[in-house]
């Protein structure tokens, strides 16, 4: 396994651990999710280029589109929560209340 793939795999696992560790703030969780999506994008791009898959060359672009949609939905949720409650603590949110 090349060194760049090992580094990207470590970046993915570090960002995934960041989601688990920093789950008290919504902004920190969103940043860690963006890190995972970025490392997944780079890994799929490198694997597509190295293995010469012509049919799956659109897979990184599709992943990037899903990452942009995830970021937009996350930011909309962050703005809504911070306008409603005044802070972005996930622990203070209760989904049972309407």
Curated annotation (Swiss-Prot):
Q: What is the annotated quaternary arrangement, including any partners?
A: Core subunit of respiratory chain NADH dehydrogenase (Complex I) which is composed of 45 different subunits.
Q: A Pfam family name for this chain?
A: Oxidored_q2
Gene name of this polypeptide? MT-ND4L
Main function: Core subunit of the mitochondrial membrane respiratory chain NADH dehydrogenase (Complex I) which catalyzes electron transfer from NADH through the respiratory chain, using ubiquinone as an electron acceptor. Part of the enzyme membrane arm which is embedded in the lipid bilayer and involved in proton translocation.
What GO cellular-component annotations does this UniProt entry give?
mitochondrial inner membrane; respiratory chain complex I
* Transmembrane portions of the chain: 2-22, 26-46, 59-79
User: What residue stretch is flagged as signal peptide?
Assistant: none
Q: Which organism is it from?
A: Daubentonia madagascariensis (Aye-aye)
Q: Which protein is depicted?
A: NADH-ubiquinone oxidoreductase chain 4L
Q: Which domain of life is it from?
A: Eukaryota
């Amino acid at each position: 396994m090349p060194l760049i793939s090992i580094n990207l795999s470590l970046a993915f696992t570090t960002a995934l651990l960041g989601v688990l560790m920093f789950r008290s703030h919504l902004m920190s969780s969103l940043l860690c999710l963006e890190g995972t999506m970025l490392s997944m994008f780079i890994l799929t791009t490198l694997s597509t280029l190295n293995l010469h898959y012509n049919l799956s060359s659109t897979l990184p672009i599709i992943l990037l589109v899903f990452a942009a949609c995830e970021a937009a939905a996350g930011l909309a949720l962050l703005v809504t929560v911070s306008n409603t409650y005044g802070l972005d603590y996930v622990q203070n949110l209760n989904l049972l209340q309407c």
